[in-house]
Swiss-Prot record:
GO terms for biological process: cell differentiation; negative regulation of DNA-binding transcription factor activity; negative regulation of osteoblast differentiation; negative regulation of transcription by RNA polymerase II. The keyword GTP-binding does not apply. The keyword Transmembrane helix does not apply. SUPFAM superfamilies: beta-beta-alpha zinc fingers, KRAB domain (Kruppel-associated box). Keywords: Differentiation, Metal-binding, Nucleus, Repeat, Repressor, Transcription, Transcription regulation, Zinc, Zinc-finger. The gene is Znf431. This is Zinc finger protein 431. A zinc finger (C2H2-type) spans 104-126, 132-154, 160-182, 188-210, 216-238, 244-266, 272-294, 300-322, 328-350, 356-378, 384-406, 412-434, 440-462, 468-490, 496-518. Residues 5-76 form the KRAB domain.
Amino acid sequence: MVDALTYDDVYVNFTQEEWALLNPSQKSLYKDVMLETYRNLNAVGYNWEDSNIEEHCESSRRHGRHERNHTGEKPYEGIQYGEAFVHHSSLQMRKIIHTGEKRYKCNQCDKAYSRHSILQIHKRTHSGEKPYECNQCGKAFTQHSHLKIHMVTHTGEKPYKCDQCGKAFAFHSTLQVHKRTHTGEKPYECNQCSKAFAHHCHLRVHKRIHTGEKPYKCDQCGKAFVGQNDLKRHERVHTGEKPYKCNECGKAFVCNASLRTHKTTHTGVKPYECKQCTKSFASHGQLQKHERIHTGEKPYKCDQCGKAFASHDKFQKHERIHIGEKPYKCKQCTKSFASHDKLQKHERIHTGEKPYECKQCTKSFASHNKLQKHERIHTGEKPYKCDQCNKAFVYESYLQVHKKTHTGEKPYKCNECGKAFARHSHLKVHKITHTGEKPYKCNQCGKALAYHSTLQVHQRTHTGEKPYECEQCGKAFANQSYFQVHKRIHTGEKPYKCDQCGKAFVGSSDLKRHERVHTGRETLQM
């Protein structure tokens, strides 16, 4: 698949040394070629994002070019490509694009490029050179085009508007890419796994998953990344910079995508709809993640244990289990976390902030995930289905835990007493029996609890709140686990089976009580 032709594809850059070696006629020829290239691309509606282009061409021989405009003369015919070029050197450049020739090689990483100018830009990833500086905030960039894009964050100018959803963009090319989110067009396909992308740069970054290449390295901690944007986001962990601010509530974010998602909590707009279940999402990224529920696709695989993930975020979090990295530190209690979103959730324990509100019952939550879980109580949606017994679940994590009832797998083992558990959360609860730690205190009765979620359930004993209501008999519960057990009275489901006599039970606590009949241990009074 051949990419759309851009000015960079046909622009040939000379260093000062190379330019000095050219004779006057060669220099003149070069200027003419660049001017003609400018005109040709302009004629087909190319969107100019670099105002310096005309500076390359302003000394051209305009009179000679003007004459050819009248005569239509095109002395060099590219027969193989069915195109005519005004100069031989322009034809040569075009041939390089078609043949894929890459004669300019980096002496540090052996990566090769078709043009010297691109090699020079690439070398800056090794040297750290950022020659293009913003005169408003001092931020520096490796490429002039990146500086121009950054400048828009100061001016806010977005003249290009999508006629389908009204979203505005700073550049025409960005609008064209955005339109593909509506049409579903993905012209850039990976030749290794056939995954397709709407944007060529996304394909380039994706290919590094296959090659293992991570060319962008953090100067402070040495961590390497697949894409430049990933590095930029990571660097903000060290600097604490949050450049994207919500103009409604003043909340700031590390990346623009997080700000866009946050803004939907104010507007409620969800323009991205799933074609399989008609569920809508605030961002295209959220839609893509959701679609993997239907397809089962898990493109992110751990090299160490082989575990695969549907989202890159979950993959990154998992990687930190192996290396033990927790780069996100709470400034109030110095507790560290493997991911930024976990730190944010934790910080809300200190601030009490609950920015995510349910529109049906006005209940508020500290995280968007908790709001989503809660909303399924109202909708009854259970998108995750067990392929062995067809039981459906609200979340994939619940499905994974349920599957262990079929396999008997208990991968989470206590390193103090050897007891094993099906869920990591159950192991965490168990560990408290050894440590006795209870950091969460009820402000009404002073009772201390091991977990924030347990504190929330406990507080319902004071408020009388019972958010989990049975649709069949109307009985309500303060605790979701009690609600789940109660529903089995109606369905007749008894998932907990005694290994010794085969008797089945509605809840795990019922099974435990029964097992004491066999062991001879006294049953606890209820």
